[in-house]
Amino acid sequence: MKRYLFFVSLSYAYPILRPIQSEIWRRGDDVAWFFTSPCDQYLQEGEKQLKTIKEVIEYNPIAVFAPGNKVHDFFPGVKVQVFHGFSIDKRPGRGDHFRIRGLFDIFCTQGSTSTPHFLELEKQYRHFKVYETGWSKTDLFFPLVPKEKNPVPTILYASTFTPGITSTPHLYDEIARLAKEKNWQWLITFHPKMSPEIVEKYKKLANALDNVSFYEGDNNVELLQKADVLLCDSSSIIIEFLFFDKPVVTYKNTSPGNYLIDVDSPKLIEPAIEKALTYPKELMDNIRKYIDSHQPYRDGRCSARILDAVDDFIAKYKGKIKRKPLNLFRKLQTSWQVKYFPFGPRYTASK
């Protein structure tokens, strides 16, 4: 029996990793969860949690899957980056999605907007391999079930937490006005790193109005399915929503395109949403072309390809390609944070 580990730092990891977990179980293998921050309250019955470094080392997984940018290098197993979203060029010129930190053995890419660039980086660095698998979270999307528009239009508002890009301070008054004046239902959800003050402000709005709901949880897929239109700024949830063949209105998107209705003033939000609710044919055609460029897979088997990639890497490349960089400072920093020093006594993790 093969054993795998999920390395989790934020609650957005659940819908990314659970499809992989389902495929692991389908194959008769085992998987456990390890958390670096307190978000284990969303674990479900039957899901296994390892709480200490000692337990992880004794569990001895063959692979560690991380949706985030970091992973403990001293954990057993090949380190697999499965990403927490799509590349949307949120901060043009930064290239955050393609940053190589020397921590991962495998990058599981999504499609033509990410794979070619990572293959170039593979040639440059030579200490990891790239596999185009599609994104595991999209396994939850398919097969798509055609959905009629809601009798009362339903608007999902989601925003990035990134300072200077988030729309939350700028759109609150307009969203509050629309919620009071328009016969629309509002669903609101934010990134786990969103400012607590902002979260509290929008929660109060939801508590005050019957047609506004604030969602905090481990899986936003139901929200994506339920809404007719997404209102956003520059977040990868845009691409997730577009998979459902529905339009997006953005406020000052950092990389606007013909697949979005982008506006630069809160006063333009209302007419933009009204236009989006008509599902204009040209816009919908552009959405479908854009989504195909990000991920061509619609078969619900991205998680299976990810596990196959791990098997292929272990069989062909483990121990045979260039070693990852020493990263001594980062390793010492991590060891100090978790009070584990693998170059000393084997088990020195704090309780």
Language-model segments: residues:
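Catalytic binding pocket for nucleotide-activated donors in carbohydrate/polymer assembly enzymes
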Residues: 101, 127, 203, 236-298
